[in-house]
Amino acid sequence: MSNPSPQAPEEEASTSVCRPQSCSMASASRRHRRERRFRRYLSAGRLVRAQALLQRHPGLDVDAGQPPPLHRACARHDAPALCLLLRLGADPAHQDRHGDTALHAAARQGPDAYTDFFLPLLSRCPSAMGIKNKDGETPGQILGWGPPWDSAEEEEDEEVSKEREWRQKLQGELEDEWQEVIGRFEDDASRDTQEPESFSAWSERLAREHAQKQRQQLEAEGSCRPPRAEGSSHSWRQHEEEQRLFRERARAKEKELCESRARRAQEAQRDKGPEPPRAGPRAEHPRGAERGSLWRFGDVPWPCPGGGDPEAMAAALVARGPPLEEQGALKRYLRVQQVRWHPDRFLQRFRSQIETWELGRVMGAVTALSQALNRHAEALK
C-alpha cells in the first residue's frame, strides 16, 4: 500500500508557482475589459462615465485599441471626445498598425476638420508633424502642403546651389531672431519691453538684403561679361522697381493697420465712457488696445489687397517677377515666394499675431496660395 504523504509538498509548491501567474493574468484581463468599456463609453458619447471610469482606475491606457481612441474621434468628427482624450493625457503621436498618428487621421477628414481637430492636435504635439506612416507620408503631405523647401532634394547647378544655401542661412538667422524677440512677450508683466519686428519691417529688411546680394552678383557678372551689360542693367532696373513697389505696399499696409488699431481703440474707449485713471503701469494698456493689435483676415499683407482668390494672388506674384524669357531668374523668384508663403513657415512666424478665431480661415487661404505657387513652379520645369 503506497503512502501519498511525500507528494503533498510537491503539490503545494506547484500551486504556489501557478497562483501568481493566474493572478497577473486575471489582473491583465480586468484591465483589458475596463479599457474596452472606456472605448465603448466614448463611442456612445457617455463622456462623463468614461472620465469617471478613468478616475477610479488611473492605470488604464487611454491610447489602447486599434484604431486608438484619438483616431476614432477624428474619424467620427467627435470634437468633445477629442478634447476629453487630450485632457486625460492621450498622445497625439501614438501610431496605429498602419503607422498613422492622430494628425494623419485628422488630415484625412479634409478642410472641415482643420480647426476643430487638426489645430488642437498640432498645438499639443508639434513634433508629430514630422512622423511618417508606413506609406512614407506626413500629415502635412496629406493636407497637400508638401515638404518644406529646405528639405527638398533635387539636382541644381552651382549658382542655384549657392543661392539656396544663402537663403537657408538667412532664414535660420531670421527665425532665431524672431523667436528671441517673441520670447520676451510670453509673460504679461514684460509689456514695456521692445515690440517684436512687424511683418512689413521683416519683409523690407529681407528685400533689402536680397537686393544687395543681387547687386553684387550683377556687378561681378558685368565685369566678366561686358556684352550682356545692357540686358543685366535692364533686369536690375526692373527688379529695383519691383522691390520699391513691394516696400511701398508694405508701408501702406502698416499705416493702415496702425490707423485701424487706433480707430478700434477710440471706439472701445467711447463705448466704455470716461473712467477715472487707475493706479499702476497696467492702466496705460487697456484690453481693447491689446486685442486690436492682433491681425484679422484683411490685415494680413496678401499679394492682393484683402486676400481673394488664391489663383489670382499667385498670378499677381508671378506677374511681379522676372519675365518668362528669363527662366532662371523666374525660378529663383518663385522659390523665394514658395518659402515665404509655405504654411509651416507662416504658422511658425505669425501665429501669435493672428486672431484665434481667424486662424483657420487665414491658414486655409495660405495653404491654397502655396499650392497655387507650387503649380506655377511645376509648370516651369
From Swiss-Prot:
Q: Which UniProt keywords apply?
A: ANK repeat, Nucleus, Phosphoprotein, Repeat
GO BP of this protein: cellular response to lipopolysaccharide; negative regulation of canonical NF-kappaB signal transduction; negative regulation of lipopolysaccharide-mediated signaling pathway; negative regulation of NF-kappaB transcription factor activity; negative regulation of toll-like receptor signaling pathway; negative regulation of tumor necrosis factor production
Compositional bias of kind Acidic residues: 151-160
What is the protein's major site of localization?
Answer: nucleus
Q: Where is the composition biased (Polar residues)?
A: 14-27
As stated in the Swiss-Prot or TrEMBL entry, residues carrying the post-translational modification Phosphoserine are: S151
The GO terms this record gives for MF are: transcription regulator inhibitor activity
Report each ANK repeat as a residue range. 64-93, 97-134
Q: What protein name applies here?
A: NF-kappa-B inhibitor-like protein 1
Q: Which organism is it from?
A: Mus musculus
